[in-house]
Amino acid sequence: MVSVLRTLRHLGAAMVLLMSISLPLAAATHAQEQISDNELVVYTAKKIITMEPAMPEASAVAVADGRIVAVGTLESLQSWTSQKGARIDRRFEDKIILPGFIDPHVHPSLPAVLTQFPFLAPDDWSLPTGEFPGAKTPAAYLTALTALVAQHSDSSIPFITWGYHPLWHGKLDRDALNKLFPNQPVMLWHRSFHEIVANDAALALIGLTEDDVRDNRMVNWHEGHFWELGMFALIPKMPFLFDPARFAHGMVNFIDMVHRGGVTTALDMGIGIFGNPTAETTLIRHTMESRQAPARVILTPIISDFISRGRTIAQAMEEIDEWRAGNSHRVLIDRRFKLMMDGAIYSGLAQFGFPGYIDGHEGVWMNPLSITTEWAQAFWDAGYQLHAHTNGDASAAALIELLKTLQKNTPRADHRLALEHFAYTTEDQNRQLKTLGAVVSANPYYHFILSDMYSEQWLGADRGNQMVRLGSLERLGVPFAFHSDSPMAPLEPLTLLSAAVNRITINGNLTGDLERVSVDAGLRAITSNAAWVIGWEDEIGSIRAGKKADFTVLESDPYKVKPSQIKAIKIWGTVFEGVPAPLPAAAR
C-alpha cells in the first residue's frame, strides 16, 4: 500500500504540474462556427434519420439555443419560420444527418498517454498522429518493431510502442528484447494497457532496480514483465509520460479522435485511472472548454480509484459531490458509479465458468466480491446508476446474483444497471438480464479481434465464435449500446457498428453468424439506445423537438450501403448543440 500511495502522490504531482504549465497549449479554439443563442436556424438535408418511431425520416430540422425546435420538411416548419424568422442553411442537402453518435465507455487519459508513441498492434489504427498498420504474426511484428526502434531519436526516453500481444506476436520477454536491442532502451506496452515488458537498457534508463520491486507479486523481474499492480512500480519512474507538453497534446489527440468518429457525447468510464481524479478532471475540463470541443464528456467515478487511495464509501460519496459541484458545459459528473468484476479480456484474465480456459489458467476478480457488493449496495441505495466491468460468463453470473441481492435489499424500478463489455455470456444469462431490468454496454470489437485467437487457444470454437452475443440481446429485447473503451477499440462508432452487423474477424472469418445484429439495432446502439443505456434519453439520442441539437453528418446512408461498406462511410463532421463542426478536409 505504501508503494501505491507513493505512486499516487507522484502522479498527482505530475498532473498538477501539467495543469499549471500546459494549459496555454490547449487553448486553441476548435474549428467551430459561432451562432447567436436566439437565432433560429433550419438545416436541410438529403435525409434526416431521426431514430424516432413516429417520424423516422425528415428533410429539415430547426434549432435554436442549442436545442431542436422542430423536425419535418421546410413546408411543415413554415409555422416556425414565418412567425419567428429563420436562416435556412442548405450545406447538408446532399448529406445524411443522424443523431449525434454516443460512445458510452472511453478513457480520455489513455489516448493522452498512448498517442505520444507509435502503435503496433494486431489491428490497423488510424489516428490524428498517423496511420499504423497492424502486424498479425511474430515475423511481421519483429520487422515492424525493428523499423520503428530505428526511427526513435529521443535518447532521453525509452522507445515505447503500444499494442503488443503474445497471442499474435509470440512471447517477448526481457532476454528476447536484450538480444534484439542490446543497446537501445525498449518497452512494449501490452494491447490491454495493463502490462509492460522492458529490456535491460530501458530499466537502466528509467532507474528501476530489482530492489524496487522485490516485494511486488505482479512483477517478474527476470522477464522484465510488469502487470496490473506491478505497473505502480514502473509508472513513477516514467515521468515523461506526464510531461506537460506531451500530455496536453495527447489530450488534444483524444478530442480529435472523438470528433473524427462523429461522437458528440462520450462517457469517461473510470475517472482517476492515474491516481489523481481531481487533477485529471480539471485537465479534461480545461482542454474541452478552452478548445470549445464539439462534444461533451460525462465522467464516471470508479471503485478502484477510491480503494487504491484508501477512501471509505462515505468519503467517496463526499468527494463525488465535490467534483459534481465543478460541472461545466462540456464536462460533468452525474449520478453513476462503476464497479469492477473480473479481469481484462485482452489479458486473458476474464472469469469463465466450466470448462474455463483450455490451458488451465484462471481469471481474476478485481476486488473480493464481498467488497464489490458492499460498495454496490451503498451507491445503489443512494440512487446511482451502476456500471459493472464484466467480461466472462462467471463474472456475468456473479453480477446477476449481485443485482438480485440489491433488488432484494432495496427494490428499485428502472435502475438500468449496465453490464459493461459483455465479452461472453450464455443465453440463459441474457434472459436473466432482461428479467432483472439490466442493460448492456458492449464492445463488439472484441469479437472482431479476439474471437479467432480465443477459439484456437483459450476457449474452443463454440464459445470463442459466440463472443459478444448481441444477436441474442436483440432477439430478447435487452437494451444495448456499443462502446469503444478507447483505445481497446477505435473510437469510431461506425467501426463498432460494422463489427456487430458483419461479425467478420480480423482474419476474415465469419463466425457466430446468428449473433449478428440488424443495421437498425446497430444504429440505435450508437444513438437512441445508447442514450437509454446511460439514462440521457430525454436529452440526446434521437432528433425530436426539445432534445439537444447534436447531429452526426454522413456522406452516405448506412441503411442503403452494403453492410460490408458501413465502416467506409465518410463522416463530414458533427453539429454540437446546433453549431456545425466540420472535420478538416484531410480527416474526411
Predicted segment positions?
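N-terminal secretory signal peptides that target proteins for export/translocation
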Residues: M1-L8
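Bacterial N-terminal signal peptides
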Residues: L11-P24
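Boundary at the C-terminal end of the N-terminal hydrophobic targeting segment
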Residues: L25-E33
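Divalent metal-binding segments
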Residues: Q34-A45, I49, P53-E318, I333-R335, ...
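His/Asp/Glu-enriched, well-ordered alpha-helical/loop segment
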Residues: H249, Q377-H387, A394-L417, H421-F422, ...
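Secondary-structure transition/capping motifs at alpha-helix termini
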Residues: T287-R296, D321-R330, D381-A382, K404-H415, ...
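Glycine- and charge-enriched low-complexity intrinsically disordered segments
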Residues: L583-R588
